[in-house]
Amino acid sequence: MSTIIYPSPVFGPVHSRRLGISLGINLLPADGKVCSFDCIYCECGFNEDHRPTLPLPTREEVAAKLEEKLQQMAAEGQLPDVLTFAGNGEPTCHPNFPEIIDDVIRLRDQYCPKAKVSVLSNSTMIHRQAVHDALMRVDNNILKLDTVDPIYINNVDHPNGTYDVNLIIDRMKAFNGHIIIQTMFMRGEVRRQETGVRRQESGDRSRETGDRSRESVDNTGEEYVCPWLEAVKAIKPQQVMIYTIDRETPTQGLLKATHEQLDAIRDRVIAAGIPCTASY
């Protein structure tokens, strides 16, 4: 299966299903992946298969490369709709993330003041005050919440270290509405060893298939959607973005959520008074 490792520190522009013409900012090494999650659906592949040998780009390198690219795009008359922190892993892991945010906002204001600054994050670093404050300064603070079920999170998102979804939700509330929730909905069955299944004798709500060697990773059912929606209502985001698999994944057996499933979930979010988009 093919996976994507993005150039660093600037790549694109690319057309984003959710954001428009996006110029990417990758704060991770150009030859590998650095992430506090290890999602079975990640287009960049598994962490252990893409260990980087190059260092993180420096703050100065990011600013210089971004300015060079924006100058080039301005000369060509093609400015981006959005400057997006994405790439090979979790951008907020970079030790100079807050300072780089300030540099990017300054360059945006200089070269493309109509463009938005967006950050795609898995939410694992929002307990850091400097990261929280930096995310408050961007236009689109897009934070992941695939489910509120801790076993599903362990089996599918594979967080490194301790991850308490209830604490994450509380920290999301602390953005006081300056937050966009992003959620991956998917279907399918995978081999247990591929999910790294962490089962418990009791309280395991993940669903078994007829083949006990396989595990369902479907989070489109009511047992997942209903508590997720209640968490979304409590967070009170400015918007919700739901989406499904769009590219090849490192784990076989994953399936896209259907248009009908995504539309039904989207409509429930909208009915709760929260703007929501679905990407298929």
Language-model features: locations:
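Conserved alpha-helical substructure of the radical SAM core
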Residues: F46-V82, N96-E99
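Canonical Radical SAM [4Fe-4S] cluster-binding loop centered on the CxxxCxxC motif
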Residues: R18-E61
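Short, charged low-complexity linear segments at domain edges
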Residues: S2-L27
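Conserved hydrophobic residues forming the short capping helix/wall of the S-adenosyl-L-methionine
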Residues: L70-M73, R108, V269
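Short glycine-rich or small-residue beta-strand-to-loop segments that form or flank ligand, phosphate
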Residues: L83-N88
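Conserved AdoMet/S-adenosylmethionine-binding subsite of the radical SAM
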Residues: C93-G196, G203-Y243, E248-L255
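Binuclear metal-ion centers of metallo-dependent hydrolases, dominated by the metallo-beta-lactamase
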Residues: T258-Y280
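Amphipathic alpha-helical segments in well-structured domains
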Residues: R59, I101, V225, T258, ...
